[in-house]
């Protein structure tokens, strides 16, 4: 699984992970923000993942938007609103068997968009 937008004192973070036994994809936002009036939810849904094959999960975090793509077949989107500027850490975790991970990280440049409204 992934811990996203975590700060060093662990007061803000979001989790995205797969429960193999229950066949559930889980997005845990119960600690995603210290801001007032932000819904802190635990979302989960049935999802069958063939764990006998390599799994590719791509996550794109752009501001408050998190987009996930699983094996180029399925996608999900959520939003998170961390308050602290140092809520930028990313961690990977696994329970159970040994997991092999390959990761690439890209830093996106700010878009220079003109809004003519």
Q: Model-derived features: where do they sit?
A:
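Beta-rich accessory regions
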Residues: 1-117
């Amino acid at each position: 699984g992934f811990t996203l937008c975590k700060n060093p004192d662990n007061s803000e973070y979001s989790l995205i992970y797969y429960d193999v036994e229950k066949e559930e994809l889980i997005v845990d936002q119960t600690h995603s923000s210290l801001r007032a009036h932000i819904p802190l939810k635990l979302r989960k849904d049935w999802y069958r993942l063939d764990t006998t094959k390599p799994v590719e999960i791509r996550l794109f975090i752009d501001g408050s938007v998190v987009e996930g793509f699983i094996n180029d077949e399925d996608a999900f989107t959520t939003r998170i609103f961390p308050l602290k500027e140092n809520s930028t850490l990313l961690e990977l975790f696994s329970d159970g068997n040994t997991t092999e991970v390959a990761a690439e990280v890209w830093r996106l440049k700010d878009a220079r968009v003109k809004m003519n409204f």
